[in-house]
Amino acid sequence: MYLIINKMIYKLFSEENMDYSDIKLNVNINKFNEPELPQEKYGYDFKLNDYRNKIDNINSDNWKKVRWYINEYDFQVKDPIINRAFYKYWEIINEFEIYEEYTEKDVILHCAEAPGGFIQGTNIYLQIEYLNINKDKQIKKIEIDNSGFIMVKSKKKLNNNNYKIYTISLNKELPQYRNYNLPSYNKNIINKHLCITYGKDKTGDMNNLDNIEYINNISKVPFYLITADGGFDEGTDFNNKEQLHYNLILSEIYAGIYLQKQNGHFILKVFDTLTETSVHLIYLLTLCY
């Protein structure tokens, strides 16, 4: 599930002309011996959870293979499209008109993004914007192709193709990550517009806030669009995926709040949102957008 959070307004702070450059947030989630319990008032279903618990009795490798094969959409991706994330992103940016107020001076940040489905989507979208096939200033608002996908809908063409994309993901070349089966950035997304960074400590870890500060320093300007598509293999602990991702999601929210320009857009991937902590994380976003 993705949260599409529009229009950064900095509601956390009362002074309209306040300088935000020196603001630091204390990012921390208390750790408990047992995972936080989901609650019915947030949509938790005991019957569904009983069925999910049965997965624990299945060999994890077999379960992953079966899960892939029973999902009819897992094998729909065809070259040169990198993965299904591209299609998710493509639908989001068109349905919510994310680039409606984008200008040539704006910059984009894609976090936790390898192999680069979202980056590929941004590349293709902005390059289409620059194509001068139709001399008319107006382009049709919306079209659907033969496969049912929304085509680019835009009201304007941009004047040049000097857009800039920044991205950060875990550095798979480091010894501590070599057993994680991390993806590499796909060659189809590498171009002059893309700046790949692994942060101050060269790990690409979003949980190290120094790496977020490093992005702020190299970009020099706040970001029009920030996406956070982070996630990791929960192993055999399927039912606690939500709880296991608390720290990562909080760090991504911190990055969004700290690095976003006013009136910018933030796309955040979350999993289940059935616990008090998840609700608080979402509430934090409502204070700022």
Where are these regions (language model features)?
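Intrinsically disordered, low-complexity glycine/charged-rich regulatory or linker segments
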Residues: 1-218
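Short interface patches used for recognition in eukaryotic signaling and trafficking proteins
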Residues: 72-77, 105-107, 235-242, 265-272
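Helix-boundary capping/turn motifs
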Residues: 81, 226-228, 257-261
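Beta-strand-rich binding-surface signature
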Residues: 86, 105-108, 162-164, 220-227, ...
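Conserved proline-anchored active-site loop of SAM-dependent methyltransferases
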Residues: 109-114, 218-236
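Short coil/turn segments at secondary-structure boundaries
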Residues: 120-125, 178-182, 231, 237-242, ...
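Active-site-proximal loop/turn and secondary-structure-junction residues that shape catalytic pockets
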Residues: 171, 232, 272-274
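Conserved Class I SAM-dependent methyltransferase catalytic core
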Residues: 239-289
